[in-house]
Structure formats: structure tokens, C-alpha cells
Amino acid sequence: MVKIGILGSTGRVGSLLIDDLQNDKDAKLSAVHVTSKLLKTLPQDTIVTNDIKVLFDSCDVIIDFSKPSGTEALLTEVIENGAKKPLVIATTGLNKHQQNLLLEASKLVPILYATNMSLGVAVLNKLVTLASKTLRDFDIEIVEQHHRHKIDAPSGTALTLAEHAASARDLNLDDVRISGRDGNIGARTKDEIAVMALRGGDIVGRHTVGLYNDGEFLELNHTATARNTFSKGAIKVAKWIVGKDAKLYSINDALGL
């Protein structure tokens, strides 16, 4: 039985993790880290703490669906204080410093980082790589749609999809990405990859990667209809990463893609 701790337990997905773990045969909820009141019923033996060290000491693996500042504290505990538990990190919006901490910590403990824990999105990333490499003359446009409360844009998933598309064409995404068009901007350049964000309603998540050419186009789409798509995926990879060597893993590693 894998003992799982949660960072970000008061968030939308964190709340679903608590529910899903209470019905899992191979894993149990052992600890939750809280920074505000937790409005959930927990198993009696669950440790509730606001101390990162206690969280590490109380589980076999930590799932992180927090904010960038929470992820930074988690990684700092590994780097500076020698905490040695595997991490599954799904926080989006990490800045460059936090990304560097992620790389440094992965030399010390196994870390699986994914901007989206959906198994379908993992397959979509592979399809985008294949299509972008094969259809080199096609223009690439990416549109992501989320609920009105999402605070970062574009989504981490959209940026990951764009990274796969750019890498497949030997391009640096920072050199070719645009986030909007307005006014008399001239014709589209050959290599640019547009990543557009839409916000409204209660959309869980929808990502469309379009490849457009004269006479034909291809659109690859993933739509999440329930948020526990992400919690169930995170639990699956948390079980997988226990016992692995220190390294930075992707969800593709866990799925054998």
C-alpha cells in the first residue's frame, strides 16, 4: 500500500485526490499539507500539517497540485534539507528559477513533472510531435479553453504542446511563439506557432492543435469533461514512481510511450 501525501489539498484537484484515494485499493492518503481551512472529511489516521518536513516524513510519495510558491518550498526542502521522497508535480506557471530548482532536485530524488496528468493529453503530445515533424509545410496554431477562474495563461498544457511541436521541427519555442494578433501585422511567418487562451464558464480543459495547409487541415483535440481525470492520472503515476532512481521523468515514462 503506497502512502501518498498531498500538497495543494485545498485546491480543486487536491480535493478530488482526497476523494479518489479513499477508494483506491493500492494507495492510501497519509498526509495533507494545508495553508487554509480544509473543508473535507479525512480518514481518521490522516496527518494534517502546515509543515513541509512533516509532510515528507509522513508518506512514501508526494503529489503536488499547489501554486508555484508551494512547489518552490517543496523543492527547497529536497535541495537544502535532504528530504528524500519521490515527487509528482503538476503545478503550472513555474518561473525560470523554479524550473531550475526542479532540475536540481531531480538529481537527488525521482520527480515526475507534467503540466497535465491526463493520460489522453500524454498521447496527444506524441501525436503532435508526429504530425509536426511529418507535416512540415503546415502552419501550427494552438487554442486552449478553460474556466473563468484559471489564473495562468496560456495553460501549461498548451505550452507543453507547443514545445513538442517546435522541437519536432528543430525550433526554439521562445523564438517562434506568439500569443495574439491585432492590427495590421502583416502575413503569417512560416515558423510561428500561435498559442491562444480562451476563458469562460466552467470549462475543465480543452486543447486543440491545428495544422493548416492549402487545401487541407488537421486538428488534434483533447477535451477533459471531469476534473478527476487529472487526480486519477496523478495517483497512477505516483504509484509508478516509488522506487525509481533520482531523475526527472515525464508522464510518457510512466505510460511507456
UniProtKB/Swiss-Prot annotation:
Active site: H146, K150
Gene3D superfamilies: Dihydrodipicolinate Reductase, domain 2, NAD(P)-binding Rossmann-like Domain
GO biological process, one term: diaminopimelate biosynthetic process
Record GO terms (molecular function): 4-hydroxy-tetrahydrodipicolinate reductase; NAD binding; NADP binding; oxidoreductase activity, acting on CH or CH2 groups, NAD or NADP as acceptor
EC code: 1.17.1.8
Entry GO CC: cytosol
Catalytic activity: (S)-2,3,4,5-tetrahydrodipicolinate + NAD(+) + H2O = (2S,4S)-4-hydroxy-2,3,4,5-tetrahydrodipicolinate + NADH + H(+); (S)-2,3,4,5-tetrahydrodipicolinate + NADP(+) + H2O = (2S,4S)-4-hydroxy-2,3,4,5-tetrahydrodipicolinate + NADPH + H(+)
Pfam families registered for this protein in UniProt: DapB_C, DapB_N
Keywords: Amino-acid biosynthesis, Cytoplasm, Diaminopimelate biosynthesis, Lysine biosynthesis, NAD, NADP, Oxidoreductase
SUPFAM superfamilies found in the cross-reference section: Glyceraldehyde-3-phosphate dehydrogenase-like, C-terminal domain, NAD(P)-binding Rossmann-fold domains
Localization per Swiss-Prot or TrEMBL: Cytoplasm
Residues that hold (S)-2,3,4,5-tetrahydrodipicolinate according to the record: H147, G156, T157
Pathway annotation from the record: Amino-acid biosynthesis; L-lysine biosynthesis via DAP pathway; (S)-tetrahydrodipicolinate from L-aspartate: step 4/4
Function of the molecule: Catalyzes the conversion of 4-hydroxy-tetrahydrodipicolinate (HTPA) to tetrahydrodipicolinate.
Protein's name according to its UniProt entry: 4-hydroxy-tetrahydrodipicolinate reductase
Organism listed in the record: Aliarcobacter butzleri (strain RM4018)
Gene symbol of the encoding locus: dapB
